[in-house]
Amino acid sequence: MLLYIVIIVACIISKLVPNEYWAIHLFFIIMIFMVYMYEKLDIHQKYQFWNYTMSGLSGHNVQVICKCY
């Protein structure tokens, strides 16, 4: 469901934003890919996915607190 919402928003933005703002289009393509990969994971893999993603974006180790029951 989340993937479809991101795809619809990306399509709307791509129609509204001119082509010279290619970075906005690239951002939504990356977001679609990340959401697609995230939805394929189970609950424990999702926890590790966000730890790895936040660590990669910030440049140092980040620990996301998660209560996985």
Swiss-Prot record:
Cytoplasmic side: 1-15
Topology versus the membrane: Single-pass membrane protein
The entry's keywords: Glycoprotein, Host membrane, Membrane, Transmembrane, Transmembrane helix
UniProt protein name: Uncharacterized membrane protein X69R
Parts forming coiled coils: none
Subcellular location: Host membrane
Residues that span the membrane, as ranges: 16-36
Record topology, Extracellular segments: 37-69
Organism of this sequence: African swine fever virus (strain Badajoz 1971 Vero-adapted)
Disruption phenotype: No effect on virus viability or replication in vitro.
Glycosylation sites: 51
Highest taxon, organism lineage: Viruses
Gene Ontology CC terms: host cell membrane; membrane
Keyword Transmembrane helix recorded: yes
Keyword Transmembrane helix recorded: yes
Family: Belongs to the asfivirus X69R family.
Main location: host cell
